[in-house]
UniProtKB/Swiss-Prot annotation:
Top-level lineage group: Bacteria
Pfam families: Ppnp (PF06865)
Name of the molecule in the record: Pyrimidine/purine nucleoside phosphorylase
Keyword Transferase: yes
CC per GO annotation: cytosol
Keywords: Glycosyltransferase, Transferase
Amino acid sequence: MLTVNSYFDESVKSIGFEQNKNAISVGVMLPGSYTFGTNAAEKMTVVTGSLTIKRSSDADWVTFSSGEFFSVEGSSSFDVNVEIETAYLCEYL
């Protein structure tokens, strides 16, 4: 089953599904600045484009480009700056 979600006035859209009992979502972010909250830990992979993020544990902003990934702790939040349309894969750990 697919679950479609929209966030931030439709500037971020994702499609969620399960694979081998693991929750996954794929989506696209339009240019902008966003703050996401997490319930579970997440592994975010940039499919195309780039994401500049700042987790609470980060001293500075860090940019991740196509093919790179970062992890976010559960029950936390992270800030994202997007300069170009960016596709991502989110695996819930």
